[in-house]
Amino acid sequence: MRVDAFDFDLPEEHIALRPAEPRDAARMLVVRPGGAPELSDLKVRDLPDFITANDALVVNDTRVIPAALEGVRERDGGSAVRIEANLIKRLDASRWQAFAKPGKRLRVGDRVRFGGEGSACLLGALDAQIAAKEDDGSVILAFDLAGTALDEAVTAVGHMPIPPYIAARRAEDDRDRADYQTLFARVSGSVAAPTASLHFTPELMARIAATGASMHTVTLHVGAGTFLPVKAEDTTGHRMHAEWGEVSADTAAALNAVKAKGGRIFTVGSTSTRLIESATGEDGTIRPFVGETDIFITPGYRFRAVDGMLTNFHLPRSTLVMLVAAFVGHEAQKRAYAHAIAAGYRFYSYGDACLLLPEGGP
């Protein structure tokens, strides 16, 4: 399918730079293909009205790490050069793949000191060596620390990796430390937030619990590839980025029990959706899953487990808008996005949400 079929124009004023306050006050466009009406303008706090006691919600409990680092290149006989690095994928206990700029000023063997004077890091700085330069322009950083010590140092010296479409319009600040983290954040490892979960508040959780529906967590560490547009002309030419995820045996069993009793599975966000579908066999059985998934969901895909999805409004030509089109149909997706733009919905990570329901849904 041609990628330009998923393109659209979004006026800049529709890009949300801060989340709604309170979070569940964000708008929610309910999309019911074939329904009457097909589109309904509500609030995220209305989500419990669509959930019954037989249903289950699945959320992603990944935690965003402060993966944006600032440092100085140190080279024998060379002048110091300021470096910005965004961690994108952990390779092992001490090595990360990262995008660094100016990349042309870095070569294998260079050392970079992140943090330094004024840093909250007890060590004063975090040191790394450029271990390799990759074909995609990224570098491999081999840190002097490993494991938990490295995690603590990154947390101390790093900044929240706010999305590029926000960073281009304002600087990251202390508010983002809280705003860009979900209520469910528990397992550190993401370099981008599972943004649909940003809408949840304790009050909304209490209302969902009152419906009798069950809540389950999975873990999928979101990579920087989530922001990248598809550059291929056709979807068949796109190579999906891989992300690490886990569906526990207990969660798989609980979700299978929900389906067996005629209940529905609602996923919160594209990350939970992709992970649950990765863990589901052709027979519809959800199995325990641990490892990387590069599932690429486009129109024509048959969903095996997910019955409803809460997600934000996504970038043009992105794999995420393709997933939305796969779930509700391409024409319904285009109508929903056109309506959202005309009605002034806020887009992207800090923006509003849409609740996608299958044809004939509640």
From Swiss-Prot:
Broad enzyme group: transferase
Record-listed E.C. numbers: 2.4.99.17
Catalyzed reaction equations: 7-aminomethyl-7-carbaguanosine(34) in tRNA + S-adenosyl-L-methionine = epoxyqueuosine(34) in tRNA + adenine + L-methionine + 2 H(+)
Keywords: Cytoplasm, Queuosine biosynthesis, S-adenosyl-L-methionine, Transferase
Broad class of where this protein is predominantly found: cytoplasm
GO biological-process terms attached to the record: queuosine biosynthetic process; tRNA wobble guanine modification
GO cellular component: cytoplasm
Metabolic or biological pathway: tRNA modification; tRNA-queuosine biosynthesis
GO molecular function ontology, one term from the record: S-adenosylmethionine:tRNA ribosyltransferase-isomerase activity
Protein localization: Cytoplasm
Family per record: Belongs to the QueA family.
Role of this protein: Transfers and isomerizes the ribose moiety from AdoMet to the 7-aminomethyl group of 7-deazaguanine (preQ1-tRNA) to give epoxyqueuosine (oQ-tRNA).
Subunit structure: Monomer.
Listed name of the protein: S-adenosylmethionine:tRNA ribosyltransferase-isomerase
